Design a protein with these regions (language model features):
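Right-hand nucleic-acid polymerase module
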Residues: 37, 86-112, 121-124, 128, ...
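Conserved catalytic core of nucleotide polymerization and phosphodiester-bond processing enzymes
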Residues: 172
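Conserved polymerase palm-domain catalytic core
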Residues: 7-145, 149-165, 209
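Well-ordered mid-protein domain cores that form the structural environment of catalytic cofactors
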Residues: 1-7
Length: 332
């Protein structure tokens, strides 16, 4: 939160890719967590269900429902509440395929509710090793899924490679996780000045921007903002929504009416939970989940004065300008 001005700091950002995680290693981590020699029957049943999985190809599902093999077909498929009932699954067994890595005892399907939990269990030993290593250096360690951040104070550039290789060693020791060199970033921060120095550690890489990007935020040594990619995505989606509204003259293919209110609801503060729930309390309506502006508000509250919100101050004017421009073209 505060400017890095006391001592030089090394910041290591790593991004891993889970290839085929080892079933035996995962089972050992579960046993260590539970402090048991063998998994209890209920735990083993869950473990077995996610390691001996079957799956169906998207194209086979599209064929079954007679849908087009494109994004539109996939969208229609996703709109179904339940893809296959038990009776259909039993009759359709030949379409399902077994885990292709089962002979090697590797791989866990992504997307199931338990997958994220097991992924964290898988990393328990590595997390402990990295935490202890970094703590001994009075540093800071954070991991979110496969994205890692390590901050080491009083760091000497001569030690950067040693820190990097040690931490990568802890991660890859588990097996099944590959550290992508092209996604690795190493920075030297001193007196609020950030210097990208990845080329000094991984000779095959070139130094990039002197900007620390992590979990959707960017830090330039003084201020924290949303990443440019996040901001661009927000404006692009807003523009596409506006174009859609005016292209179809405010009526969907199904005959439902849409207007600019939908645009404001999704892409302005008027759609935020804080704004809508305040109206709901007055009008007796139901509460809603909110949008990006709730995220911005929470970011400001948590990060403090160092957080710069570049969207909120000008977004309403930008929406109005875009709508007025489209309306003018629409009526010509």
């Amino acid at each position: 939160r505060n400017r890095c001005s006391i001592s030089p700091v090394e910041v290591i950002l790593l991004s891993g890719v889970r290839n085929n995680i080892s079933h035996s290693y995962l089972k050992k981590q579960l046993c260590d967590l539970l402090n048991v020699e063998c998994l209890p029957p209920d735990y083993y049943a869950i473990f077995k269900s996610v390691t001996r999985f079957s799956y169906a190809e998207m194209n086979d599902l599209l064929d079954y429902y007679k849908l087009e093999k494109n994004k539109n077909g996939q969208k229609q498929l996703n709109q179904r509440g339940k893809l296959l009932d038990t009776k259909t699954i039993r009759a359709w067994k030949k379409v399902f395929k077994k885990n292709p890595n089962l002979p090697e005892a590797e791989g866990v399907p992504q997307g199931s509710p338990i997958s994220a939990v097991l992924a964290n269990v898988y990393m328990l030993k590595a997390d402990k090793q990295i935490y202890e290593y970094v703590s001994a250096l009075q540093g800071f360690y954070m991991r979110y899924s496969d994205d890692f951040m390590v901050v080491i104070p009083n760091a000497a550039p001569v030690d950067f490679r040693k820190h990097y290789e040690t931490i990568c060693g802890f991660i890859t020791e588990a097996g099944g996780i590959e550290i992508k060199a092209e996604k690795t970033r190493i920075f030297f921060v001193e007196n609020g000045v950030i210097r990208n120095c990845i080329a000094d550690v991984i000779f095959s890489q070139e130094n990039g921007k002197d900007l620390i990007d992590f979990l959707g935020f960017s830090f330039d040594g003084k201020e924290i903002r949303l990443r440019e990619k996040t901001i661009s995505k927000y404006y692009n989606r807003m523009h596409r929504k506006a174009v859609t509204i005016f292209k179809c003259s405010g009526v969907t293919k199904k005959g439902n009416r849409i207007n600019a209110n939908e645009l404001y609801k999704k892409y302005s503060y008027k759609g935020s939970a804080a704004y809508q729930n305040r109206k709901a309390a007055i009008n007796g309506g139901k509460h809603i989940e909110g949008n990006l502006f709730d995220y911005l508000k929470a970011s400001k509250r948590i990060i403090g004065d160092n957080f710069v919100d570049s969207i909120t101050p000008r977004h309403m004017a930008r929406i109005r300008r875009f709508i007025n421009g489209k309306q003018g073209k629409h009526h010509k």
